[in-house]
Amino acid sequence: MRTSWVRGRRRIAVATAAVAALCGAGLTQGGTVHAQGKAAETPWVVSLGDSFISGEAGRWSGNSNDSAGGYSGTDRAFDQPSRTTDAHRVYGASYDNGCNRSDSAEVNSSPAPAGAHRLNLACSGATSTAILLPEHGGSPFKSEPSQAEQLQMAVTGHPVRAVVVSVGGNDLGFEDVIVACAKGFVTPIGASPCAPTQAPEVKKRLPAMRTAAVNSLADVTTAMDRAGHPAGSYRLILQSYPSPLPDGARIRYPGDKYDRLTDGGCPFFDKDLTWAHDQLVPDISTTLASAARESGAEFLDLSRAFDGREVCSTTTVQAGPSQRPTGRTSEWVRFVTTGAGQGQRQESLHPNHYGQLALGACLGLQLDRTPGDHRCTNTPGEGPRAMRLGPAPRS
């Protein structure tokens, strides 16, 4: 563990930035002056981390079980004139290695700062190991160098407004938890809620997730130092995760029945839904907020950003022949799919196109405010651009 030497790094970074830039990165003095002297250039905003910020599931505008017309207009990879489907239309070349960086990913859809250069280095499935520098255990992921390495190379010589990071969910094993809960629901014999067994296991893993986030932010700071960007010259933001599922009282398929699987794409017991929404996601958020404070980073709390917009929520509807998708009424999260005909399984329970527009709006609001910790929420009945920012709760 490296947290013992991490705590003081941000406090002394300004004083040592020149040495780190000149010696640690092997830059010449002229190179450093060049990096700081391009103030007139459009500033960069960079995203690093996992699938919740890379743009996984951005292919979908809502959910539909009707395959006609590109699943009732929800499939953004579908071209109506040619009647062809190609996920590269949404994910570009990143579809080939599975990073799935969508055109509507948070950093791309954020309205602020206006005219900024957007760079999305995040990759679906990434753990902290995919972010760390090689000397601290970082390694290539999906045939790409570690994200901290990519960051250092990309921003050297360019002004940077902000670096926003989403990390921790995969270190915690969030996907494994969801899979276990779904399997518990669909098991023909002996089906039972997962919360009683998963909750204590997740609690045990939260400290390690916190350490992973702290170490990731430390290496992002180091990479920025080496690129000629001392702490304080840019904004470092760690964000949490929105809940993809409603609590058990707000699901539009009552009774723990199989229509949650066959129609809704939310195969979970009420007890598990309530645990995930009311305890799991908030606990993750609280833990990440603590990591941000230790690292000297801002914190963007997204844990309640999708309230009322989750998969199978009573206040959303699926698209169909008589219901076109819209950000006001459709779900903002991709429903659970096997990947047979409806995109990829890995898109399940990720922010879809509307959800990503909402997260982009949250980031824009964060960057418009004075640096600090904030919570982003939506406006009931309005679209994904009508997000609101308030103070983050203190834990």
Each language-model region and where it sits:
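Catalytic nucleophile-elbow at a beta strand-turn-alpha helix junction centered on a G-D-S/GDSL motif
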Residues: 43-60, 65-77, 170-172, 353
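Secretory targeting and sorting signals
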Residues: 1-36
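A structural motif corresponding to the C-terminal end of an alpha-helix
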Residues: 106-118, 209-236, 277-301
